[in-house]
Amino acid sequence: MPATLLRAVAGSHRVLSKAHQCRRIGHLMLKPLKEFENTTCSTLAIRQNLDLFLPDKTAGGLNKSQILEMNQKKSDTSMLSPLNAAHYQDEKAHLPTMKSFGTHRRVTHKPDLLDSKWFIKILKRHFSSVSTETLVPKQDFPQMKRPLKASRTRQPSGTNLPVVSVNEDLMHCTAFATADEYHLGNLSQDLASHGYVEVTSLPRDAANILVMGVENSAKEGDPGTIFFFREGAAVFWNVKDKTMKHVMKVLEKHEIQPYEIALVHWENEELNYIKIEGQSKLHRGEIKLNSELDLDDAILEKFAFSNALCLSVKLAIWEASLDKFIESIQSIPEALKAGKKVKLSHEEVMQKIGELFALRHRINLSSDFLITPDFYWDRENLEGLYDKTCQFLSIGRRVKVMNEKLQHCMEPTDLMRNHLNEKRALRLEWMIVILITIEVMFELGRVFF
């Protein structure tokens, strides 16, 4: 009887140890599974650990059909082969001896401890999320090239024009500024030698202007006319492109301080005009000339429009010159901001100041930008056409903006001039101090020696 009790106690001890071992195995197998959901590297670690405690002796506790079924599952899911082999064991099958866990006992595996369908579902969900992140390529959008930036001061009237209907009677008026001044006397003779006819029916107070007629106009509705202003501008009315190029070539011989060709062709003004019945006017960017006027009155109205166009193109040239000057002094505030020395001599600073004063003198003193010319004082109808065209071309606003820019440009140049004057005064003071020191040394030498 005591022997029977001892065997029963020993058997219960083995049962408890086996149950405890099953709990340890389940806990150790579930922990890597949770880590497997987070990272793919943990999946490889599980496979390596399971390969250690799954020797070939495991097949001894399985029948033949179960081994074949297990091998088929292993071929389907190669990465999950150790776990699938453990899942397909029945009640007679046992887990292999696991030396890695520090024991030689074999414990019975609980069939529903790990559900392969649940585990495969987790893996599919994990790999599907990974694949969506890795398979989507990064799209490289092509860089769009920016369009070329136009001049900051350029405001051609053509950009403000509304869309007009196609009209066969529509003619063109184009203005260019090619130089600072023209020799009108020599130009008149040169153009007359090329077959152009001078119009001499202008009033006596319309000085500093030359009007030439063209035989072959661009369209038959209006005779071709060219206005040359002494200020260095030319306005073409209903003139062919071929004739315009020829006149511009002849004009090069009589220019004083000509401008760059590219700048001349860029800073131009072009308006469309048409002959109508009624009073002449500028309506929505289109010149409408009275068709009932005689030749002399039509020339005067064209002169009013041409005068405003001349001011616009001259102002555009000076705006471009001011922009170029601003770029030349742009390094001064940048150098002062960075604490660097400004490498400008006193002569260069005075030259910059002279350029500013010359440009301001041209705009405010030697041109008609600020006041209406005397020619329009007793001609109210022509003054209205002139003012309307100047307003359309924004001449008053552009002159105001340009004067403000000139005022701002004077500040860094004045600063540099004062700085150079202070350096010169400091240099003179040091020279005086050195001379006084030398004189004192001579006096001391005379006293003591």
Curated annotation (Swiss-Prot):
Cell location: Mitochondrion
Coiled-coil regions listed: none
Keyword Lipid metabolism appears in the UniProt entry: no
Predominant location category: mitochondrion
Keyword vocabulary terms for this entry: Mitochondrion, Protein biosynthesis, Transit peptide
Signal peptide: none
BP term (GO), one: positive regulation of mitochondrial translation
Top-level taxon of origin: Eukaryota
GO cellular component: mitochondrion
The keyword Mitochondrion is annotated on this UniProt entry: yes
Transit peptide, residue positions per record: 1-16
Chain's role: Required for mitochondrial translation, possibly by coordinating the assembly or maintenance of the mitochondrial ribosome.
Similarity comment: family membership: Belongs to the RMD1/sif2 family.
Subunit structure: Homooligomer.
UniProt-recorded name of the protein: Required for meiotic nuclear division protein 1 homolog
